[in-house]
């Protein structure tokens, strides 16, 4: 399988729980398969099960670490928040979908 970049975004303010921008999420027309996520300038906490993360609840993604979020449901349910109040991290996201012939 070959994956191609479908889009990218920077989430600049994670002081409150926030998810991916809806226009990047999978639809019948937009075949996004997964999102590559990086915490920049600080750690964040995230949930992909529909619960809301807090500064002390959720899976911790350390500064400059990356992780992948696979599948439409997990991408819709993804929420993240800064791990330490006023640490001002940002989140970089690259969205991938199917492409090419393999």
Where are these regions (language model features)?
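A short "linker-to-beta-strand initiation" element
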Residues: 1-10, 100-102
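Surface-exposed ligand/attachment interfaces on beta-rich extracellular proteins
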Residues: 8-30
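Noncatalytic modules at the cell exterior or secretory-pathway interfaces
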Residues: 33-35, 71-89
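Short, surface-exposed beta-strand/strand-loop-strand elements in extracellular ectodomains
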Residues: 38-58
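Intrinsically disordered, low-complexity Pro/Gly/Ser/Thr-rich segments with frequent PxxP/GP/PP motifs
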Residues: 56-73
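Low-complexity intrinsically disordered segments
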Residues: 91-101
